[in-house]
Every structure is written in structure tokens, then in C-alpha cells.
């Protein structure tokens, strides 16, 4: 016969077991910010990818705002789209997306510097840099050559 009583852990022991047991679940739901990348610009748009870890419950978001460099106030952009190992198999493409957010800022002016602000938030918590401000220039409009060569 065992000499361990069924309730020998007590309330403190039960709380410790529940907290330790819940820690991995919370860690997987919390988002960890990794690298933010700017895609090659176009004349009137800028594209971005922000790689992350965690956020297994997909409730993290990235708010986007932008402005011409040095101007006020910030304009609101579309939030970045959440991607998590989606399979892309259109035409000749066979690609699996990383765990990340991605999106674009549209309707910009050619050959202009923009400050772009990205704020990562998650009800479960954010590890790493939750806000990034980057300066990116849209492409200039190509002009035909003056020479006839």
C-alpha cells in the first residue's frame, strides 16, 4: 500500500503544477519579433516582410503607418497580413511561406523617401523589438535617353 496521500501536494503544489504546465502553451502563443525586411520598391509602392516565431494562436497583429520623411502626421496603412507556412503552388511556384507578416504601402510618389512604422502587438505578449521605423525610397521614374546611340 502506498503511503502517498492523493491530496498531499496541497494548494501550493497544485498551483505550481498548473503554472509550470501552462508555461509552454503561453510561450508558443507569445510572438517573438525577428527581422523586418523591405522588398525592392516600385514607383508607387513599398513592400515589407516581418519574420516572427511563436504566435501559434494567430492573434498577433502589425499596425502600419507611414509619412514622407520629415513630415507630419503619420498616415495609417493597411495592417500586415499574417502568414504561417502556407503552401503556394500556383503555376511554376512551389513555395512554403515562413512564419511572418507581409504587406505593402500603396499610392505613394515616385523617387520619394518615406518613414514607415510597424508596431507588432499580441495579447499573449511580444518578445524582441515590437516597433520598427525604417526609411525607404520609392523608385524614380525612368526617362528615355537624350542620346540617339
Residue positions per predicted region:
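Structural beta-strand segments of beta-rich domains
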Residues: 44-48
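Extracellular fibronectin type III
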Residues: 121-144
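Bacterial N-terminal signal peptides
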Residues: 12-22
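Recognizes extended acidic, P/S/T-rich segments that occur
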Residues: 63-111
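Boundary at the C-terminal end of the N-terminal hydrophobic targeting segment
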Residues: 25-28, 33
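Solvent-exposed loop/turn segments flanking beta-strands in beta-repeat/beta-sandwich domains
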Residues: 53-66
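N-terminal secretory signal peptides that target proteins for export/translocation
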Residues: 1-9
Amino acid at each position: 500500500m502506498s503511503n502517498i496521500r492523493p491530496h498531499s501536494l496541497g494548494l501550493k503544489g497544485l498551483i505550481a503544477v498548473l503554472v509550470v504546465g501552462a508555461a509552454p502553451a503561453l510561450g508558443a502563443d507569445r510572438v517573438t519579433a525577428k527581422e523586418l525586411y523591405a522588398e525592392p520598391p516600385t514607383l508607387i509602392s513599398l513592400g515589407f516582410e516581418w519574420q516572427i516565431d511563436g504566435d501559434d494562436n494567430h492573434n498577433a497583429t502589425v499596425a502600419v503607418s507611414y509619412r514622407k520623411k520629415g513630415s507630419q502626421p503619420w498616415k495609417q496603412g493597411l495592417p500586415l497580413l499574417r502568414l504561417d507556412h502556407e503552401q503556394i503552388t500556383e503555376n511554376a511556384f512551389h513555395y512554403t511561406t515562413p512564419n511572418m507578416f507581409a504587406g505593402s504601402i500603396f499610392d505613394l510618389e515616385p523617387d520619394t523617401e518615406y518613414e514607415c512604422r510597424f508596431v507588432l502587438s499580441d495579447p499573449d505578449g511580444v518578445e524582441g523589438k515590437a516597433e520598427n521605423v525604417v526609411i525607404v525610397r520609392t523608385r524614380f521614374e525612368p526617362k528615355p535617353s537624350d542620346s540617339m546611340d
